[in-house]
Amino acid sequence: MALSVHPSIGVARLGNANTDNFVLNPMEIGGLPYEHDVDLKPTTTVVNFKDEAGCIRRQGQVFKVFGASNEELTLDSPNVKNIEWTVHLANKKAAWYEFRELNGNLLYGRDNSYSARGVPWRNASKTASSERQSLIIDLGPRSVSGVMATVEISINNIPETYLHPSYPSGELLQGSKHFESLGTLRTDSQGRLIVLGGYGFAGGNTDLSGYGGGDDWYDDISDGSVTCVVTYSDDSSETSTAWMVVGSPDFAPEIVNISTLSDTCFDVGVRNFDLVPDMYDSATGHYKSDYVANFDRDILPIIQRISQYQWVSNVQSMSGFFSFQFDYRDGSAANKANRMKYYNYFRQLDNKVIGDYDQPQQVLMSSEVEGDILPLMPMNSGSNSVSSSNFYDLTDNVVEKFLALDATQLFLLGQWAEGEFTAGPADDYPVSDMDTASIGNCVGLPMCPGIEMTWSLQNPVIYKDAYQIKHYQDKAYFDVNGLTPERDECEEETGCEPGDLTKRMACPWQADFFNCTIQTVNFSEPSVNKASQTETVTSRTHYEWGNLPAGVSVPDQSSVSATKNVDEKVPLPPAYYSYWWPPQSPWDVLTGELDTEGQLHSHLPAGQQINYARGINSYSQMVEHWSALAFIRDRNQNNDGFPFFTETERNHELFDFKEVLVGQVTGNSEDNETSLPVFFINANKESLEGKGTKKGKLMASYFEERAFSKVRSSNIRPRSGTRMRG
């Protein structure tokens, strides 16, 4: 009997509510998480994402094991004696290289390796092997079996057999003072595994220095191996494996990224593991032109995702891509011109080479001719719209300004345009629904670095098969040797250690989340994203001279009165206002309070478009108050085709509000007939309790009880666009 564990890559999401207050994973792409009963079985979709104190509930991932005939095996199965699950989670962020966009991505060749690019380590002052290993948060593996069992992945129960545990000990000076846990393992009433992640811990000993985070900082994001051993009634046993990733909360779970991590894994599987041999010829490395796509399975999801972006971003020019201005299902030759026009508005993929900037993903508009101008699709920033070709003292930094769909998505869209498609029901691809549902709710593109994981998932060398992460070693090896801080799984090509899939992400995650929504991107110079700026103020004196011979003139005199160097590099104009991952990190949203009390505390009417992160005005505030952000939900979800997405569960009590008259800024009283809304945090106990709500009082108690120190930031260089909020 051949076992398989699903999902093959599970995704949990951290939260700061108490240990037992959690939800279970969505069961479809764009689905809501589930409540559970006393047996830990899913019941209804989530009622509230937060507890009464405004803390976010953790989202657990359910794992199931299946036999050779694809039947689920549980402790109720007649031939099953025991099911034991072992999970080894780790966080390697502090021990990895500094974040430098696409530097280190070996899909661009060995010349783009971390060492070839001269990328420094995080916490570079720690050089000894033992010091580097100590930067990893690694509490060793935990095992759980039976029914309704619970094991915490805590500093207080590290297995004696695990010889090299490590974690930030002592009291940290900023943020969360004490690290305690990477999460929880539980089993339900039939022995299925539920993995819950951390509690939103983020702390350090230095000031935060940018969207990559800071040295000597930690968070409790993690990833690692899942191993299932099924023992049968005759005492024989079989083993199967999977992988687990703990990410940040998904604040708009029903809105799906145009290219998800499931799309990434599908693309890798098609082109490297013969996942759909009728679609791709692995011998020639080309897609098959006679492959027949299916509209409902392959094309409609892209259109639906595009239609949802309007609820979390201002992308009016995308409306033509879901307006059904022609019959998208019509595959006739007469309709081909319409389909081709649609397809040609999607930019093509760059070749992954260093130094070639004359490529499709550097192009914003469809044309330079007035009357034929439309931003190409998708309207997202690319995986490096931040740093120019000469940044980091490099001759040829990789620049990727704007997004393109992945290769397989583009191929299927092209087949639709050519008329090589059917409409209606179609056979499913050979991928488990559980596999697609887990990572299908994660960001697939762009990757700068991403939200949950990054561009290493595009590299086939980390997989043993489609959708299946290759494990580097087993429990016995890690018990003795521990984890390796400097090992690059994409370079060695021998599999992943716990912590490898999330180590390239920002540390702490909140730093990048604060700045990972908007990017203003230059679209005129393919190799340039940003440049330094010198502002020079001159004065000019004009003299009138008389009694001069014909043809003689005296030039005006000028002098420099002030020069100012702008230390921060800024986008070179002309630039375009582009989004990163609005479904995961919303920006332009609708207010949703529908009762008197809610509107009094929100200071806004319902239905007003407003900045999602209003009131979170710094990196340090994001680290401390990330759980105050709203969840975006479809308030009309029972009526398919008529969505109404608004904010819900925002912690309004945390924020104070003032209308600032424009005249206060300009000094001109005539400007005072216009005001600007300003939201800011007031977290003192008196302010929270003074709001007069139960939630405000509980929030005040929560802030008093937690162990947290003020977070500072210095030398901040935010991603362009984030500072100014409309």
From Swiss-Prot:
Activity modulation notes: Inhibited by aminoguanidine, amiloride and beta-aminopropionitrile.
Induction field: Forms part of an operon with lodB.
Post-translational modification as stated in the protein's UniProt record: The cysteine tryptophylquinone (CTQ) is generated by oxidation of the indole ring of a tryptophan residue to form tryptophylquinone, followed by covalent cross-linking with a cysteine residue.
UniProt crosslink position (4'-cysteinyl-tryptophylquinone (Cys-Trp)): C516-W581
Alphabetized GO MF terms: L-lysine 6-oxidase activity; quinone binding
Catalyzed chemical reaction(s): L-lysine + O2 + H2O = (S)-2-amino-6-oxohexanoate + H2O2 + NH4(+)
Keywords assigned by UniProt, alphabetized: Antibiotic, Antimicrobial, CTQ, Oxidoreductase, Quinone, Secreted, Thioether bond
Assigned EC number: 1.4.3.20
Complex and partners: Homotetramer.
Protein name: L-lysine 6-oxidase
Organism in which the protein naturally occurs: Marinomonas mediterranea (strain ATCC 700492 / JCM 21426 / NBRC 103028 / MMB-1)
